[in-house]
Amino acid sequence: MAVPLTGSDRLFLGALGTAGDHRLHIALAARLPGPAPTSGELRRLAADSAARAPVLTYRLARGRWAPDPAFDPAHHVVEYRVAPGRDVCAAVVDAVRDNRLRPERPLWSLMAVHGYAEDEHVLCYRVHHAFQDGVGAARIAVRAVLLGRSVPAPDPTVAVRTPVRARMRLLSTGARLAAPSARLRPPPGTAGEAQPGARTFFLRLDVAAVHGIAAATGASVPQVGLAVLAGALRAWNPSRWRKAGRRGTTVSFPLNLNGRLRDGGLGNGTTTMPVVLPCAEPAPRERLRRVMEQTSVGRMAAYRRDRYPVKAPAAVFRLLRWLVSRAFLGRLTVSVIGVSLPLDGCFAVPPTYDTGGGVVSIVHSGTTVVASCVFSAAIAHADRLPGLMEQALDELRREVAR
């Protein structure tokens, strides 16, 4: 049965790109021990995953999501071999970039990246950002692909027309994210002669430090991650934040609406919540407290309840699309996803669509916390941010331990 597009689906397919645009592809990758699966094993895994998760058979058809009558799991597997010693994260980014999705088919693929080491390979689930948001993609990758569990079929009746009040609040959110206070403030300098595009960095954070801070303060892992990023941005451009009382950097913090819009993991079921990172605050623990205040369960529930883009009149949608096109320019989006896997190496590949800003996507489990960072090539000294995040985490850990 066909499922209508949500407002987010339409934005990602219309205002930001097309179904075949690899810059809007996202992925969840898992480093696994042993040799890569054979071609036959990979095809069987794709077929079994589609049987467990019917969403994997849906494609774009006449402005809706609909089951593909010619679905063939063999069209959704990719074997990508790299040279020995190749950096594993860079290899996965290359695999996503070099293997485009076909817009006439369901917008996903299962990729086996191997060759970089004799005793390890990567299994990567890649989708278009309109087909699934980060949480939806992680849910399918973990449940259907890696754990072999079933996922309900998409429900076409869940997505309903938004009330007028919700539309106005959503427009207000877009205006906040398009405001000057949301623009990234890099340190003085130039990005050199870098070509247009985006640069990707990966950072494995000290999981013991993250979990220790969370246990000692009552914070969640996402809250710790946001506070660490605030400290890194402060150290990145200290002259900007030396003045006390200066307003911080407003970032877009996506919230998944699974169950609110539809079940089954189909479409981009997210809204976004503005969070002001207190970069001007010199005390690490106070930065964490301010982040916790803005990301309370109550505030997130309110955004999930009444600020979601499903169906709206054409005029409202055009205004929202205009705001979104400005809300991403030079801005920062921060997402945090938890996965329940006993693996020591899960990480995300965020979209590489260059908006002049950046994306930080943190994937955490009981054993690892990995930050995947994508920044515009136009931003000076972006390569310093991963190291500054490590320093900010250590500063927060030491202050909490006092």
Each language-model region and where it sits:
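Soluble acyl-CoA-dependent acyltransferase catalytic core bearing the H(X)4D motif
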Residues: 1-9, 23, 29-51, 58-355, ...
